[in-house]
Amino acid sequence: MITSLYQSLCNMETNIADRVALRWYDEEKQGVAEVHYAQYAQDLRRFVAFLRAEYGDVRGKRVAILARNSYQYVICMYGTVIAGAVAVPLNLGKDWDAISYELGLTEPVCILQDGEFAEREPALAETYGSILKPMDVFAAYEPAEDVTEVEDLSALAFIMFTSGTTGRSKGVMLSQKNLFSAMPAFLDPFDDVKKYTGWNTDEFSSLSALPMFHISAMTSLVSWSITGHSINLCNNLKYFYRDLGAMHSEVMAVVPVLLKSIYSDVMKGRRDRLNGLCVLTCGAAMFDPKILSDMMEKGFFVAQMYGLTETCGDGAWNSSQEAKYLTSVGHVDLSCEYKLDDGELCMRGNPIMLGYYKDPEGTAEVIDACLLYTSPSPRDPKTSR
């Protein structure tokens, strides 16, 4: 079982090197570009070489990423963690006030960016111009051949900012141990796909349309690289149908707004626009049971995923295709402990975050004796109220 990004890198080089790793629509070529896992691994090593050359010992140092989904984004995010640094993927859609707060909090050694945010918010270059780097900066370096496992897989590896619906976003601290402990929640549902449908999931490709700062996109990318499947990247929802049409994809992680669009096409007889899409993993909110039931009747396999950034996306999943079970949370992660406290779901286990970055009080509000309280409401940890 692969339990770290370094082990995943080695797997790319030794077992799945000749498989297609990622595809995307290349605007300049006006067509699809792709890389195999062998090239993916080499570019990860190049990124490690870049960090070492520019910043020396990067263990524990933060590297911010502010860009749209791209192949380079993937390399920057995972290369950072393989090098022992901390990846900080930021939400390109936020304003300067929010981004400047998050950059000030995390104090990155560099900000990898594609220019879009800087064009919209000139204050980025004015304030952080000396540490801005292009997303493809690693391409000029030779691959580092002496990459090894990080010393501690329980150490901080990612800072993922929450949506911030009740004030400033909180920086969720996640380790590689958190990430890989959650992998069964993303891999096991595909055993159910085989059982229910008989489809050969070994040949599936997945369209990644959610931004990489979203926990679902990040964890899905890791899980698919473990199994050696192909990931098709969509960097802008306005090009969703173009990209879906250009890159055949069986699987997609969806949030409610995406599901509604897909549902509309299916119910209006426009399923051909979906180019073979047949498996939907639904997360981020409760979904209308009627929509799910209708999609199943039309031949889709639908899995409902329940998790938080604070649980590395883990929690529970419902892969039943029977209408009477659509409102159930389904299976839980048997490696974790669950309990209800005054109607609130609590969870303890290896996928649970390390805490909120530089926010011990906020951490204490939701974690009591390693037990995560899933409600965002403040409470007294002594009384759990």
Predicted features along the sequence, with ranges:
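Structural core segment of the AMP-binding/adenylate-forming
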Residues: 78, 82-143, 148-149
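Gly/Ser/Thr-rich phosphate-binding loop
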Residues: 250-254, 262-324, 337
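Conserved AMP-binding/adenylation subdomain of ANL enzymes
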Residues: 180-205, 212-251, 257-269, 276
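Conserved AMP-binding A3 loop
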Residues: 34-38, 157-184, 385
